[in-house]
Amino acid sequence: MNQLTAYTLRLGDNCLVLSQRLGEWCGHAPELEIDLALANIGLDLLGQARNFLSYAAELAGEGDEDTLAFTRDERQFSNLLLVEQPNGNFADTIARQYFIDAWHVALFTRLMESRDPQLAAISAKAIKEARYHLRFSRGWLERLGNGTDVSGQKMQQAINKLWRFTAELFDADEIDIALSEEGIAVDPRTLRAAWEAEVFAGINEATLNVPQEQAYRTGGKKGLHTEHLGPMLAEMQYLQRVLPGQQW
């Protein structure tokens, strides 16, 4: 697999896995409006995943977005560890969403300038959706943080719990570095300042605290995932595994 294919696959996997997680909220959100909002955000991410995975399949010269989504094993997925974390309670979902939304906005803003026209076009469409997603997640971060004692406590606990996965957002490997030097990709290390400016401001507005430095978790890009991804994929891929190639 060449570097551009691998890079595009990472972007698609992030969107696909997070979309699946948000879909698990359908019918279970705290209120109908939130249920619809999470479902719509999940559908936006699914659309982004289709665009990235379709392009990855085109670059690879085989398969399509369905092949990549439904026939790969856990170790073949290269998504960030953050997006595969369980929904938990509503505060957990909001913290996870806010962290990735802030990163997506920073990433797609830069990736629109990619020398690869397809990546630039996908990002130009995705940035509009990502900005809406960020408004939603930051809005709820502030509501929960400034709400009751219980909601504020749950929001702080969610931030503390998921903070260890945020360092991977800025972890650069040889693929990131090589493609960024060619003007195709974005070096994730250069996204930290924009992400921290947004996230620190959001946490401050929510009257919450930025967690202290801690032992961070990485490895998703290399296919080294937490125990949560495998069961999620088993459910997501079940039908194609049982009835390969079937259409409906």
Swiss-Prot record:
One annotated Gene Ontology cellular component of this protein: phenylacetyl-CoA 1,2-epoxidase complex
Induction summary: Activated by cAMP receptor protein (CRP), integration host factor (IHF) and by phenylacetyl-coenzyme A (PA-CoA) that prevents PaaX from binding its target sequences. Inhibited by PaaX.
GO biological process: phenylacetate catabolic process
UniProt superkingdom: Bacteria
Signal sequence interval, chain numbering: none
Residues noted as binding substrate in the record, renumbered to the chain: 76-79, 177-179
Pfam families recorded: PaaA_PaaC
Pathway membership, UniProt: Aromatic compound metabolism; phenylacetate degradation
Alphabetical list of InterPro entries matching this protein: Aromatic_CoA_ox/epox, Ferritin-like, Ferritin-like_SF, PaaA_PaaC, PaaC
SUPFAM superfamilies reported for this sequence: Ferritin-like (SSF47240)
PANTHER family registered for this protein in UniProt: 1,2-PHENYLACETYL-COA EPOXIDASE, SUBUNIT C, PHENYLACETIC ACID DEGRADATION PROTEIN PAA
Known partners and oligomeric status: Forms a stable heterotetramer (dimer of heterodimers) with PaaA and a stable heterodimer with PaaB.
Functional note: Component of 1,2-phenylacetyl-CoA epoxidase multicomponent enzyme system which catalyzes the reduction of phenylacetyl-CoA (PA-CoA) to form 1,2-epoxyphenylacetyl-CoA. The subunit C may be essential for structural integrity of the alpha subunit.
Official protein name in the record: 1,2-phenylacetyl-CoA epoxidase, subunit C
Lineage: Bacteria, Pseudomonadati, Pseudomonadota, Gammaproteobacteria, Enterobacterales
This protein's encoding gene: paaC
